[in-house]
A protein has these predicted regions:
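Short amphipathic alpha-helix used as the core "switch/output" element in two-component signaling
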Residues: 42, 65-76, 96-99
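Active-site beta3 strand of CheY-like receiver
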Residues: 47-53, 58
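Alpha4 helix (beta4-alpha4-beta5 surface) of REC/receiver domains from two-component response regulators
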Residues: 66, 86-112, 118-122
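Helix N-cap/capping motif at the beta->alpha junctions
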Residues: 33-42, 63-64
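Non-catalytic signal-transmission and effector/linker regions of two-component phosphorelay proteins
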Residues: 1-6, 112-130
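Acidic di-acidic motifs
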Residues: 11-12, 113
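Conserved sequence signature across two-component system core domains
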Residues: 10-11, 34, 52
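Two-component/phosphorelay signaling modules centered on CheY-like receiver
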Residues: 14-32
Length: 130
């Protein structure tokens, strides 16, 4: 049986966006892609994805957090993954395990860029309860 679940991927780096979309399609999921926060918001106004993957820093330093917040506000049950290189580039650390970060980071999983496809596949399946 073909998988009909759709994953929204938003990243301003076209190479990262293409690679992530390629991998997710190879996992058997449909993908919708957007190259910026604004385009992601437009898609979210019309489509309810089964899961969303957002880059953190796009046109603004907090674009991914804003998209996560808006996604959870409109579709509270849609899992959100933030994939970013911010932690390795800036040394900033975010944790979905601490109360302070969990209050304002409306994501279900936070992953550093460079994630192996098998790790990403495992996280997607876990969040979608596959």
């Amino acid at each position: 049986m073909e998988n009909t679940r759709t994953i929204l991927i938003v990243d301003d780096d076209p190479d990262q966006l293409d690679q992530m979309s390629f991998n997710v399609r190879n996992f058997g999921y449909n993908t919708i892609t957007a190259c910026c926060q604004k385009e992601g918001e437009e898609i979210l106004s019309k489509v309810r994805p089964d899961l969303a993957i957002f880059d953190l820093m796009m046109e603004n330093q907090d674009s991914g957090f804003i998209l996560s917040y808006k996604t959870k506000k409109k579709y509270p049950d849609v899992p959100v993954i933030i994939v970013t290189s911010v932690t390795s580039v800036t040394g900033l650390k975010f944790s979905l395990e601490t109360g302070n970060d969990k209050q304002w980071i409306k994501a279900d999983k936070y992953i550093e860029k460079g994630v192996r496809p098998d790790q990403l596949h495992r996280e997607i399946n876990k969040l979608l309860k596959v």
